[in-house]
C-alpha cells in the first residue's frame, strides 16, 4: 500500500523525551501522533492526507471520540513547504466541501522533534487486539465515520 512504517510517538510539546504517562496527563503540550514513512512512488502525500481526513473528526477540538484532552487534538505536522502547501490545500478543499456542519479545527504546523513512544505503544491495536476492539466499538468512531463518508 506504500506505507513502509508507522511509528507511534509524541510531538508539539515542551518536554523533551516525554513518556506516555506524562503526555496522557494532558499538560505537556504534546499530541499523540503517528509518523508515517512512505514510498511516494506507490502512494502520494495527498492520498495519505485523504486517509487521514477519513479517519478523524476534524471538527473536534482537543478530543477524538472517546479520547479527551489536548493530546488527542488533530494536527498535521509537515516536513517542508511542499507538504505544508498540500496539507493546507487539502484542508481547505475539505472545509469548502460542506461535508461538516462545524468548522475544521485541525492544525497544520511544521514538524517539531518527533519522540518515539514506548515499545508497548507500537502496534497497540495488534498487541492488545481484544482491548482495542472493545474501545473501538464503544468510542463511536466507527458510526461517525460510516455516517460521514457513506456517500463517497
Which positions does each model-derived feature cover?
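Flexible coil/turn and secondary-structure edge motifs
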Residues: 1-152
